[in-house]
Swiss-Prot record:
Enzyme class, spelled out: transferase
Organism, scientific name: Human herpesvirus 8 type P (isolate GK18) (HHV-8)
Keyword flag DNA-binding: no
Active site as annotated: 201
Catalytic activity of the protein: L-seryl-[protein] + ATP = O-phospho-L-seryl-[protein] + ADP + H(+); L-threonyl-[protein] + ATP = O-phospho-L-threonyl-[protein] + ADP + H(+)
Keywords: ATP-binding, Host nucleus, Kinase, Nucleotide-binding, Transferase
Protein name: Viral protein kinase
UniProt PTM comment: AUtophosphorylated.
Amino acid sequence: MRWKRMERRPPLTPLRRSRTQSSGGGLTICPRCALKLPKATRISERPWASTWQLNQHIQVSKTKKATAYLKAPREWGQCTHQDPDWSKRLGRGAFGIIVPISEDLCVKQFDSRREFFYEAIANDLMQATRERYPMHSGGSRLLGFVQPCIPCRSIVYPRMKCNLLQLDWSQVNLSVMAAEFTGLMAAVSFLNRYCGMVHCDVSPDNILATGDLTPMNPGRLVLTDFGSVALHSGSKWTNLVVTSNLGFKQHCYDFRVPPKLICKHLYKPSCVLFQCYLSSLGKMHAQVLDQPYPISPNMGLTIDMSSLGYTLLTCLELYLDLPLNNPLKFLGSATRDGRPEPMYYLGFMIPRVVMTQILSAVWTMTLDLGLDCTGKAQAIPMRQEHQLAFQKQCYLYKANQKAESLANCSDKLNCPMLKSLVRKLLERDFFNHGGHPHTRGLVF
């Protein structure tokens, strides 16, 4: 009778009471019963907090100094997605392959279990933060997963139309593209300020489009691929440990990053290429290239914003239809006698230096990256052989561009919004130690 009287009364807390008694004689909360409650019965000041408690996101089981021990949700261990079409392949990389499931879904299959957990955790942290700040416009520009699947070692994502390199740039509208890249700027800012993360791999391959960037079918641009994300030094945790349900360690992640692994070389910030160049020279900087370092929030914003800016420069080259041949053919060899070749890293400065020179002439403004086409750098006296080689390669790169396309640059680039956008994206970067002096961050 006692239990029946209690069951007729509404519970005093949003959790169900179990019939077990504690050591003091009082009733305890049954965790199994609590997990079965629907969302509406939970009382919380923030929807994000209730979502976290409902075990839909990863949970922090314990902490130790700056290390967080994480436990994956039970839902991740259940394979409920459809079988992918293995006969078709949408993409491939060092992680594995991407294959379609349907017209709206695709699956990213990982070769490594460690890499799978890394991207799943980073994506889940981003989505949890996005639920906490639903009004921030940048959150909607980050592509979240649909479902991770531990048994299949794969992550289900929404299927987009294409990436930026696959767009038909002859039909793209500059005003639409500028508006979409402004949204991507908000995404990078959201990731840095609210998520405490640095993407570290912003490039045309990792920016997906849902439309054609035309007035009739503008679509949206979203940033994807969180497999290279790093937590910056402003976040609460610097190390993450994935544990099993029994508490055993499975994978440990340290978010210090060496300069050579920050972004693809073609979109790597100039300040990072500067460190790679110094490291390839040897002497006191010989160990910089492979040495992992923590990334400060300011430097993290410089990395992602600058990479987004160089992605935009690549898109403008495609829009103007400038290059006759592949720009990468002007790069030198990566190594010589087992050591990194200095001109190899300087070669990745060539496309951006030439393009900023063109834009500076068209828009009558100064876009200074700290290195010009003559090979003169403001931060360091360049070796004469490197300066002459860089000057020669810049000349060849200009000769590789179509003359008729260069003649029409002024008419095709008549977009004030785009001019302001390029300046904002590149204002933090400089070919020196740490970026532009007024936005410098400590990373090395």
